[in-house]
Amino acid sequence: MENYIVSARKYRPSTFESVVGQHALTTTLKNAIATNKLAHAYLFCGPRGVGKTTCARIFAKTINCMSPTAEGEACNQCESCTAFNEQRSYNIHELDAASNNSVDDIRQLVEQVRIPPQIGKYKVYIIDEVHMLSASAFNAFLKTLEEPPRHAIFILATTEKHKILPTILSRCQIYDFNRISVEDTVAHLAYVASKEGITAEPEALN
């Protein structure tokens, strides 16, 4: 059991290309980076397990990559990518709103937003389960979302878009993630099985 890693973490996508079942969406995100047409706020919506947080992390890393590949992926070699991969990046911050949903939590985040990045162009703030923020926390966050510093990008993720205030929705580019199809799920299971040296019949995977 030593060094055991849960498969969901071991095979979590780390590039746009490896994201399962969201090709149109990841292509749009890559194009936004390539053309330097980045919004200050994004809202990733969809059911659990479709890749919202994973895509947010890949997007955040690629935004700050100093030498993106010709395919629009992060290089994983520059200081910004290395810092992210080693979980020591000061430019990418994550907040789980399910357990950090108070006004004080948001005010602390707003204070961080004011400080420009030391490396790279942007500081990216990923707020997961954003619908869990209290009404007062949403209101405290709204002004920053209305007038963000040029170096700040927010990526909000939610399973319940209908709970987000209209004033927040109107300031975000909204991306609706698809449910992952049976075909894509089976193909990914086959890939994982092959990597693990497991022989699996197609009927078993399906």
Residue spans of the language-model regions?
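P-loop/Walker A NTP-binding region and its immediately flanking N-terminal helices
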Residues: M1-I174, S181-D184, A190-S194, P202-E203
